[in-house]
Amino acid sequence: MKAVADLNLDRFMGDWYVLADIETPFDRNAVAPLETYKQAPGGVVETTYSYREGSSDGPLRERNLKGFVSDASPAIWGMQIFWPVKAEYRVVYLDDDYQTTIIGRTKRDFVWVMARTPSIDPATFKALLKTVQTLGYDLEKIRIHEPMRSLHATNTTINAKSSDR
């Protein structure tokens, strides 16, 4: 799975709303997840994963992670979930305006579809899901977060599961 070429790490930093994903063991109850990236010295990206637990009015939770940028490409990171494990984290799609992105793994076990805003145009979202499918992911495993879930509800072309998250 190829990472994007010529990623400008400075432009990539900031807030990214998770619109859809394949849930991990660490985010099963996550509602309205947000990833925030901040560059730190030594090729490190400080990552804050925040979300509401269980429902949109659930308690706010936050996890602090570290991304270690690969020497081979700024679009490939080792994301340290807990020491000493670093999970593969690849920016596999990024639009020219740095407004939408797809993060994937060569194992195709997890994927994140993200945007700078909590929701995007349904046609753009559908195209992103199609890209996820083209990358080899099973769309039946995709969890769509609100508010994209409501906007996507009438889509019958792509079969991504909607969840209460």
Identify the function of each model-found stretch.
Residues 1-165:
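A beta-rich soluble binding module of mature secreted/lumenal proteins
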